[in-house]
């Protein structure tokens, strides 16, 4: 009488496991850079959306008072920057009394940009030898104020 032995153990061989790990590694190598790219792109888009909301508040301030933040005449492309748009001197959320006809607040609060920095208003922002009034973010590297570089996100409000 012959005895037959059956091995009912099932599982993956070492080669099969290594191939599965290699496939997971390749997929991760493709997915992670794309994830980082879209995360960065999403932050830039969020910043642009917030800048457009600030622009609407800025326009309402200009319509009511004839002024931009820092009590500059609306449309004027000269003057000092405003680094904190939440301050009463900016006139968007509260007034320090220097905005006749103020009927705000024009925005509940000015958020920080997606990288944790304040948005700014610059009514003498220079691009290619032309002056603009602009609102902006210092972008992912957060370098500023008065240090404008390529990663800044700028929304032009008015030009000279």
Cite the ranges covered by each PLM segment:
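N-terminal leader/signal peptides at the extreme start of proteins
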Residues: 1-12
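N-terminal signal-anchor/signal peptide hydrophobic helix marking the start
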Residues: 12-22
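Conserved catalytic core of two-component sensor histidine kinases
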Residues: 21, 48, 55
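C-terminal juxtamembrane segment of a hydrophobic transmembrane alpha-helix
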Residues: 24-42
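Membrane-proximal amphipathic alpha-helices
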Residues: 40-52, 67-68
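Short, glycine/small-hydrophobic-rich surface segments
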Residues: 58-106, 129
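Short, surface-exposed interaction loops/tails
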Residues: 59, 114-160
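Active-site and glycan-interaction determinants of carbohydrate-active enzymes
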Residues: 97-111, 138-146
